Amino acid sequence: MVEKNSKSKKFIDCLLNFQDVKDLELCDDQGVKVSTHTYDVLNISINKIKEKYIKLEEAQKKVDFFAITVGIIMHDISKSSIKRNEENLSHSQMMIQNPEYIISEVYEVLNLIEKQLGYTLIKEVRENIAHIVQSHHGKWGKIQPATEEANIVYIADMESAKYHRINPIQANDILKYSIKGLGLTEIEKKLNCTAAVIKDRIRRAKKELNLKTFAELLEVYKEKGRVPIGDKFFVLRSEETKKLKKFVDKQGFYNLFMKNPLMEYMIDDKIFEK
């Protein structure tokens, strides 16, 4: 017996194996892989759907689970192509100044997968996916979300950026190497972060202890073995981001999407032309 969502699963599998999607694992945004952020947007979106509709069985009547899943996978795909093509504009700049670049890439990828699998997306589904991608920056982009799916992804992307897009490097990570005599450049390499991140984390720690110099902070670390890393909001963001990164690295970006609970509610006849 053929599963009602066999085509949907194959399409998403093919998309996840598309090179620009796989390359999201190689793109870093403030210390967080873009692939990790992409999963976070999916997870937040699912939680938003459950909050509003309680049960996924009810939500599927109002929300296109296929479009929202594919839209999320593709929402930052241009970060891969922009890097590969050495474009002058960043992803955020492209969303405002050249949204045609974003939308043309979406349709190109969808067309390639359709051709590879021999499936054709229903026009409304295709357009919904494209709209999700080109409107996911909301008021910070050129196109505003106009569908239920696009609005969910916009809010989820915004929350992920606010709470989970921060390099989880902490002052204690830096001081651990400083106490061994390593300089700024050496610590940058050890922690795989920029000098700006290091200086920010030291500034936050000094502020919490009301200290003026790095030497004073280092003395506190020597005495106590650790220092406060920042205010409550920063601590929350840092710890949650660290857990998120560890979880996605362990479970795998591909596996998390293929096992996401929206998959079982997808119905091929509502997604693909017959």
What are these regions (language model features)?
Residues 206-242:
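Basic, Lys/Arg-enriched C-terminal extension of HTH/homeodomain DNA-binding domains
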Residues 1-89:
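Acidic/His-rich, divalent-metal-binding segments that scaffold phosphate/diphosphate chemistry
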